[in-house]
Design a protein with these regions (language model features):
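Eukaryotic low-complexity, non-globular regulatory regions
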Residues: 1-114, 119-120
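Structural signature of eukaryotic scaffold interfaces centered on beta-propeller domains
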Residues: 135-147
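Short linear interaction motifs
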Residues: 123-138
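Structural motif
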Residues: 160-164
Length: 164
């Protein structure tokens, strides 16, 4: 199997940091997870098991790695209350994305202790997201209506707050 999805989520059903935090964290990481998942598929990076999803979940519990269900390598990342308070105090999107990247990198390194994880390839995807200005945009479709002389370009823009 190949890696097809990279997620940064809160531990299911609750992270231990409160429902309000859990909901906002999920929405704030959505754009990054979508970007990483769309781009990791193009790389055709093989896994060492029957999973195609690398899920890094924040929690108050201890760090651990396990293969769960049929297709998921689940990495639980212990995050302290002080890290959460620092995160909540961040005002810029760039700071938040860098915090997400640091969590993902911790997850990759933890998973790599017991599984084959292409850390360098994943880190290149992080850099690609930075180089694009922390934006998740892509061309959806181009259509030419020759009889009207119109060229239509449809682009997707996914931010932490909306999807257009």
């Amino acid at each position: 199997m190949n890696y097809r999805y990279i997620y940064l989520i809160k531990k299911w059903p609750y992270s231990g940091f409160g429902e309000d935090f859990d909901s906002k964290f999920r929405y704030n990481t959505w754009t990054l997870c979508n970007f990483l998942s769309r781009h990791v598929r193009k790389l055709h990076l093989p896994t060492d098991g029957d999973y195609n999803l690398l899920s890094c979940a924040i929690t108050k519990e201890k760090d651990h790695v396990r293969v769960c269900s049929v297709n998921c390598l689940d990495v639980s990342l212990h995050v302290s209350d002080s890290e959460i308070q620092r995160y909540l105090a961040m005002r810029s999107e760039q700071e938040r994305f860098e915090f997400y990247f640091s969590l993902l990198e911790r997850g990759y390194r933890l998973a790599a202790l017991s599984h084959s994880v292409p850390i360098d390839d994943f880190l290149r995807l992080h850099q690609q997201f930075r180089d694009l200005g922390y934006r998740n945009e892509w061309l959806f479709k181009k259509v030419m209506l020759r009889e009207h002389g119109i060229k239509i370009i449809l682009e997707h823009v996914l931010t932490q707050y909306e999807y257009n």
